[in-house]
Amino acid sequence: MCGDVQMTGNVTLTTAAAGAVLIVENGQLDTNGFTLQTTGGSGLTMLFSGSSGSYTHAPTGGGTLDFAAPTSGTWSGVALYQDPSLVTGVNISAAGNSPTWKITGLVYLPHSSVTLSGAVNKSSNGKSCFVMVMDDITINGTGDILENGGCAAAGLNMPTASVPSGGKLVN
């Protein structure tokens, strides 16, 4: 799709496990308060592309995104992807008393400032796997770090590293 897209009702997609790729070029996906979801066993990668400029390259609109990334194929494990060549119009804010982002998989927003306010959970039909790559993040209200042990089953192979014994977290 080229340009801004505004939803006028709830949308449910059914795809193969290898998933579908929804590309929005030089525009935003305005959920307009509605829900974009996939059925169980379906996979979706939402990709924002185009040229930097006066465009918003992100989901907006206060609705709900409820989908899992594909579990196989080229976009395996990738749920939301912003083209890394985009450097403007990439910031994202999601808020709500219930999760507005119910996403399973990798959310890749390499140049985004992300603000989340009570807005994230796993997909209704997905595994426990939510991984974000972003420039910086602000979490308002209650924030929680969830165990990501479901990432391999969700099609996302996480990198591993060995930690020497005696390591600790410091403030």
Question: Each PLM stretch: what is its role?
Answer:
Residues 147-171:
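Protruding loop/beta-arch "assembly-hinge" segments enriched in small, turn-prone residues
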Residues 1-147:
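Long, polar low-complexity repeats
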